[in-house]
């Protein structure tokens, strides 16, 4: 998809860009694959705020996505490419030979009418899902499982991809987009290709209201708060934070402080850590 630019007829339109949705072939979703998605506004079951900057936004329905790709031996035809308000990637509606319909994340280059399949014997082509042990070294993949049968968890957002680097015993070496090299069980599945909608990261929102339509509320700087609201708050005028390092609203060091818990069982599976920005 290409970027669409607007004439600067208002301050909100100036520099605003959006996607032209040229890849989208159908606007109405498949009813059998929809579920209600009630608003949470960042609150938990006690009504307490657990996620900041969430609230409002347009009503949405959840599209049930097949992350497991476990329907082996039955070919499926790509019926349409659709927009999904719940993720950055587009989704593709598959119609299997037995009549079942499922949504998958639409990889780059997937076309309407194309035939895809899952299983160890599937061909190495875009949209097919296979166990990692059956995918050649050097192949670009997405929607990668961390546990066999759990469903894809890695490389699912727009433009995301990983690469198979090698195979060692029951593990396969994968290079993630962050630069991290990780060992994953060879029986875990992944889908061939890169996630589509690559232009998503280039979109300029243009105005605050467009973020509100998405359910994103403003992010207020701690330095403009009061001392009882944030460790950076208080002082006369534009005062410095007065601490050795920046702090989170709850007084924990942030902006560079590592937050990964030590001695995780998966530490032994990380061959090389992610690249530093």
Swiss-Prot record:
One of its GO terms (molecular function) is structural constituent of ribosome. SUPFAM superfamilies: Nucleic acid-binding proteins (SSF50249), Translation proteins SH3-like domain (SSF50104). It comes from the Bacteria. Signal peptide: none annotated. GO terms for biological process: cytoplasmic translation. The keyword NAD does not apply. GO terms for cellular component: large ribosomal subunit. The keyword Transmembrane does not apply. Keywords: Ribonucleoprotein, Ribosomal protein, RNA-binding, rRNA-binding. SMART domains: Ribosomal_L2 (SM01383), Ribosomal_L2_C (SM01382). Residues 34-55, 213-277 are annotated as: Disordered. Part of the 50S ribosomal subunit. Forms a bridge to the 30S subunit in the 70S ribosome. Belongs to the universal ribosomal protein uL2 family. One of the primary rRNA binding proteins. Required for association of the 30S and 50S subunits to form the 70S ribosome, for tRNA binding and peptide bond formation. It has been suggested to have peptidyltransferase activity; this is somewhat controversial. Makes several contacts with the 16S rRNA in the 70S ribosome. This is Large ribosomal subunit protein uL2. It comes from Staphylococcus haemolyticus (strain JCSC1435). The gene is rplB.
């Amino acid at each position: 998809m290409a970027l669409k630019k607007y004439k600067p007829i208002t301050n909100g339109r100036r520099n605003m860009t959006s996607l032209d949705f040229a890849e989208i072939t159908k606007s109405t979703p498949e009813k059998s694959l929809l579920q209600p998605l009630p608003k949470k506004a960042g609150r938990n079951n006690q009504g307490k705020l657990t996620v900041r900057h969430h609230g409002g936004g347009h009503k949405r329905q959840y599209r049930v996505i097949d992350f497991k790709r476990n329907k082996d031996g039955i070919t499926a035809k790509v019926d349409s490419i659709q927009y999904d308000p719940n993720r950055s990637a587009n989704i593709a509606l598959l119609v299997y030979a037995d009549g079942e319909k499922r949504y998958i994340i639409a990889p780059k280059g997937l076309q309407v009418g194309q035939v895809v399949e899952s299983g160890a014997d599937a061909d190495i082509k875009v949209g097919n899902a296979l166990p990692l042990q059956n995918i050649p070294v050097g192949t670009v993949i997405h929607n990668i499982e961390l546990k066999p049968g759990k469903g894809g968890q890695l490389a699912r957002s727009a433009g995301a991809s990983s690469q198979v680097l090698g195979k060692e015993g029951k593990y396969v070496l994968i290079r993630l987009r962050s630069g991290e090299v990780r060992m994953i069980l060879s029986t875990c599945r992944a889908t061939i290709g890169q996630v589509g909608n690559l232009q998503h990261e280039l979109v300029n929102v243009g105005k605050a209201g467009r973020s509100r339509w998405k359910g994103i509320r403003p992010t207020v700087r701690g330095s403009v708060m009061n001392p009882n609201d944030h460790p950076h708050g208080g002082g006369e005028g534009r005062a410095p934070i007065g601490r050795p390092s920046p702090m989170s609203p709850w007084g924990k060091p942030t902006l560079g402080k590592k937050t990964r818990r030590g001695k995780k069982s998966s530490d032994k599976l990380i061959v090389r850590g992610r690249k530093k920005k």
